[in-house]
From Swiss-Prot:
Reaction(s) catalysed by this chain's protein: L-citrulline + L-aspartate + ATP = 2-(N(omega)-L-arginino)succinate + AMP + diphosphate + H(+)
The UniProt record lists the keyword Iron-sulfur: no
Name this polypeptide is given: Argininosuccinate synthase
Binding-site residues for L-aspartate, renumbered to this chain: T123, N127, D128
Organism the protein comes from: Bartonella bacilliformis (strain ATCC 35685 / KC583 / Herrer 020/F12,63)
GO cellular component terms, A-Z: cytoplasm
InterPro entries: Arginosuc_syn_C, Arginosuc_syn_N, Arginosuc_synth, Arginosuc_synth_CS, Arginosuc_synth_type_1_subfam, AS_cat/multimer_dom_body, Rossmann-like_a/b/a_fold
Amino acid sequence: MNKWTDVKKVVLAYSGGLDTSIILKWLQSELGAEVVTFTADLGQGEELESARRKAEIMGIKEIYIEDLREEFVRDFVFPMFRANAVYEGVYLLGTSIARPLISKRLIEIAKETGADAIAHGATGKGNDQVRFELSAYALDPDIKIIAPWRDWTFKSRTDLIEFARVHQIPVEKDKEGEAPFSVDANLLHSSSEGKILENPAIPAPEYVHMRTLSPETAPDKATIITIGFKKGDAVSINGEMLSPATLLAQLNNYGRDNGIGRLDLVENRFVGMKSRGIYETPGGTILLTAHRAIESLTLDRGAAHLKDELMPRYAELIYYGFWFSPERKMLQAAIDLSQEHVEGEVTLKLYKGNVIVEGRQSKKSLYFDKLVTFEDDQGAYDQKDAAGFIKLNALRLRTLAARSSVL
């Protein structure tokens, strides 16, 4: 029985790929609904007009294809990097951070077109279904959300491929002559899952990596770059002021050429299972190292340590899909306040998968060489003061030791 009989018009997050092309036809045939397609250019590097052509062939009248690269980096990626956010110590959240923006536009387009539902192609096993829907409900509590993977009878990607063949929907092939890996990509990263990658004991084939040279084949000569920061955001490379998306794209090029940003990860999904993914985040890996380096000069110790304590919770909120939650916004306000004086330049050496800090400088620096010098500090610091500092900090330890000696 069709539980969506009252749905007349649906906005579909449409990539033009296998899953969403099948979903489009399923929405038309099973629901009898009018479908509006929305394709976001987040820097995935694909020719998006093919999505328009596929949608037109399938009878779609309202087609939205939008370049959201600048908004994506400015309003989502950069705020996240101010926090130095990584999930489970290593994952730079490239997929997670893209979902709130897509959901935001789905809701906006639904209102513009009079649609009463939105739809996405995330499976019932993954995190993306949660991220899309939590974001959508945060922006429109009454929106209807259709997740075909949770409703239809297909059980696997093999079933989808057979459906596609029956309905003459093209299926692209990868280098092994089989159906493609499950791939997600945007300006921040790319990820690959599925097929041979589902066995975490087997190394990922080299052809899975789409965005980086292997460190072994990267140039033998290092690349030196300087990144400029203002209020915690990267604003320039080698002295040239750049827009957020242009800057990240250039960092991606540097990272690609030097084999930087590869990650083979088994992660804990929000839904409770573990999954294995191959991630490439070349520009983001460079940016994270540079941002931490400029913070080391300009952030007070207390603020820096508190940020590091809050970061895992902040990263978890993004990974789980709570970008629009009050707690994420509260943390963001604190993080943004901490970035007021985070400005200056960081010089990096990029070499065969490594990002090495060569130097950093800032007019807002809290590093004073007269305080730390091993030479004559001309009275800037009286070493005798350390004795009282140590004695007071040792008081509770001495008290504990005294009690132990009595016992």
